[in-house]
Amino acid sequence: MSQFTYKYTTESELFSFDFNPVLNTGETLSTATCTAITAQGTDPNPSAVLSGSPVISLGKATQRVVGGLNENIYRLIMTCTTSDGNTYTCTGDIPVYSPTAT
């Protein structure tokens, strides 16, 4: 699991997962699906932090993340299929804070 640096509720950022260490020589990512859950805190709709679909480039899958609720930790679950028929999953936690919270 990856631990990403925090983001503010007001930010829109890209978060990438590097699958290159597990890919065989010549193997490429074919599809990517990203899911968001709340790892800590409460959010009735954690998938709302996902903006658009993941983008695949050079063995990495990247997802845009927006908003989120103050003091929650969101877990991104990125699952990719490959040209060799393999399926790999990476996860990463993103702490979210409000820039105006005291």
At which residue positions do the language-model features occur?
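Short strand-edge motifs at loop-to-beta-strand transitions and within beta-strands
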Residues: 59-63
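C-terminal edge beta-strand
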Residues: 86-99
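Beta-strand-rich extracellular modules
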Residues: 79-83
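Extracellular acidic loop/turn motifs
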Residues: 21-31, 40-45
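Short, conserved beta-strand segments of beta-strand-rich sandwich/propeller modules, principally
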Residues: 73-77
